[in-house]
Amino acid sequence: MNIEVLKKEISEVYQTPILHQTAFWSEVKSNLGIKSKAFEFKIRNSDLYTNTGGRSYTVSDFLVLIQQLSKESTIAYVPYGPEIEPSEENQGRFLEELSEIVRSYLPSNCIALRYDLNWQSHWGKDDFCDDEGKWMGPPQPNYQEFHFNYNTINWNFKKANTDILPVNTIFIDIQPDVNTILSKMKAKTRYNIN
């Protein structure tokens, strides 16, 4: 896999509907004391996607937030990026190589690079539903790590104990009146809304 990565100006980040990957978000975070860096990358589509040949490339970018943890350490964080989603069997390898390249642009005291990906969950398939079609939730973290590290060289991906950004989205029909919507919710959910 060959990825070309270039640092770019925050103001040149591509427009996207993903708020956390915009120049605006970088400015918001800057006002909170969090620094940002932007990177553009180019990769051959045959390295990203299975059953893709030819010489076509994908060019995309992503924003990295750098937060001071202590006087001695920082952490780099990529919220909902990178946007492009490789085929499942190429995801770990792609993210590993991208991370290794970006590492040289990060502060020397950076202790981790965290991604909260906006990719389709591996665990949302029918295999993770019970006989009634209800989702059983994700597997144990060690299984998730094993699955994501598949096809990587260093096996360095670790599942975070908590998620920063929402990982599951629920759609609510807002056509009915408020009382009807609330009546369909569990009592604890209603309590947390009110």
Question: What does each model-found stretch correspond to?
Answer:
Residues 1-19, 114, 136-153:
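Short N-terminal secondary-structure initiator segments
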Residues 1-32, 183-194:
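Short amphipathic alpha-helix that is part of the acyltransferase structural core
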Residues 17-20, 55-58, 62-63, 91-94, ...:
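A short linear-motif detector with a strong N-terminal bias
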Residues 25-28, 62-67, 100-102, 152-160, ...:
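Intrinsically disordered, low-complexity boundary segments flanking structured domains
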Residues 31-136:
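Conserved donor-binding loop and adjoining core beta-sheet/short helix segment
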